[in-house]
Amino acid sequence: MTNAELLQEGINLMFAGVGFVMLFLFILIYAIEFMSKLVNTYFPEPVKAPSTKPIQAENHDLERLRPVIVAAIAHHRRQQGLK
């Protein structure tokens, strides 16, 4: 065989290999998509109900915490020698 024939045979084998790999990857992608749809039909994820009332801190809780926060800040400043 001449060098040109060997080069041509190598190129043919390269394209055949690339073609088979691409074909395998496409089949793999479609198989994974199919399995995902199949699993989701038999085992759907439960839908969580939205909470009807947003969580908010009530004003009386904040009013009760205000002196505690002020005392904690004053204690910290006394320890650090800031005041």
Curated annotation (Swiss-Prot):
As its record notes, the protein acts as a catalyst of: oxaloacetate + 2 Na(+)(in) + H(+) = pyruvate + 2 Na(+)(out) + CO2
Which residue ranges traverse the bilayer? 10-32
Which terms are listed as keywords in the entry? Cell membrane, Ion transport, Membrane, Sodium, Sodium transport, Translocase, Transmembrane, Transmembrane helix, Transport
Top-level EC class, please?
Answer: translocase
Fetch the Pfam families from UniProt.
OAD_gamma (PF04277)
Q: Which cofactor does it need?
A: Na(+)
Enzyme Commission numbers on file:
7.2.4.2
User: What GO CC annotations are associated with the protein?
Assistant: plasma membrane
One of the protein's GO biological processes: sodium ion export across plasma membrane
Which cell locations does it reside in?
Cell membrane
Which Gene Ontology molecular function entries are recorded, alphabetically? decarboxylation-driven active transmembrane transporter activity; oxaloacetate decarboxylase activity; sodium ion transmembrane transporter activity
The UniProt entry lists membrane topology as: Single-pass membrane protein
Give the similarity note: Belongs to the OadG family.
Q: How does it assemble?
A: Heterotrimer of an alpha, a beta and a gamma subunit.
Q: What is this protein for, i.e. what is its function?
A: Catalyzes the decarboxylation of oxaloacetate coupled to Na(+) translocation.
Name it: Probable oxaloacetate decarboxylase gamma chain
Species of origin:
Pasteurella multocida (strain Pm70)
